[in-house]
Every structure is written in C-alpha cells, then in structure tokens.
Amino acid sequence: MEPADKVLMIDHEKCTGCRLCELVCAVKHDGISNPMRSRIRVVKWEQEGLYIPMSCQQCQDAPCMNGCPVNAISHNETLNRIEVDYDICIGCRTCVSVCPFGAMNFNTIDRKVIKCDLCDGDPQCVRFCDIKAVDYVDAGDVSIMKKKEAARRLSVANKKAAALQATM
C-alpha cells in the first residue's frame, strides 16, 4: 500500500499519556528528545485521566493551506499530504490559528510552523506506540473502523441500560 492510501488514526481511549510518540517524533525530525519540537502533541486533561494525541489530519481542503498568506503550504498529490515549504514560510502563524484540530505547531527556535509529515510513509509515533493508540491504516478502512466502534459502544450502552433497568 502506498503512503498516499494511508492515514493516521488516533484512538484517544487507548492513550495513556506516556508521550513517547512526542519524543520519537522530535528525535526523528530534529535529533533531540524535546516534546515541544514534536509534530504530534498529546493534549492532557489529567484530572479526567484523558489524553488525546493530536496530529495533522491532512485535510483535503486544508484551512492552513487556504489561510497561508505566502502560499508556503500545499497539498502533495503524490503522497496525499499537506506540506510546508520552510523556505517560503514567514512564521506568521496564520495556519496555527485557523487549524480546526490544533495540529499546526510553532517552532520558536526556527520561527517556522511544524506539522506532521507522516514520516514519509513510516510514522515513528505508530512504530513506538505499543498500545496502538496511534495507528497508520488504509484510508478506506477508517470509516468502516469508526462505524464498528460506534456499534460496539452502542452495544455496551444497551447492555448497561438493560442491567440498570433490571435493578429497578
């Protein structure tokens, strides 16, 4: 399967908040284990025990691309991903403010935006996530997987409701 046919799929219910995905991403791209240099970010709500890895969704009609005043962001048709041309990027952060997923990050050292590039088809966050909270799957399977998960959740909810009703 070509990289263009695959996407990152994130299951926040599996994420434990270990942040290993952030570390391996930063090491892969910048050679340092600094989570602030990562292209994937784990948003944490510690009191609720909720951790959500956030990464570029590689939107077809990307707000970051449409909002860039210097056209530094484009859609690579071959790899089916959104890319930043760092030679053109002026670091204005417009893309950061318009991304509906909060997936565009700003590198304060280089004064440029950074975002997931899918590691050229071999995402390291997936490789190192032992619990598979982050996976790299066939794009066509995402909708099917989400429907199966919704059906599973509905089944669990029905069983809980039936058990609750039986106790009344």
For the regions a protein language model found, what residue spans apply to each?
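A generic structural signal for beta-strand entry/edge sites
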Residues: 7, 79-81, 113
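Flanking helices and flexible, charged tails adjoining ferredoxin-like Fe-S electron-transfer domains
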Residues: 2-5, 37-38, 43-65, 86-168
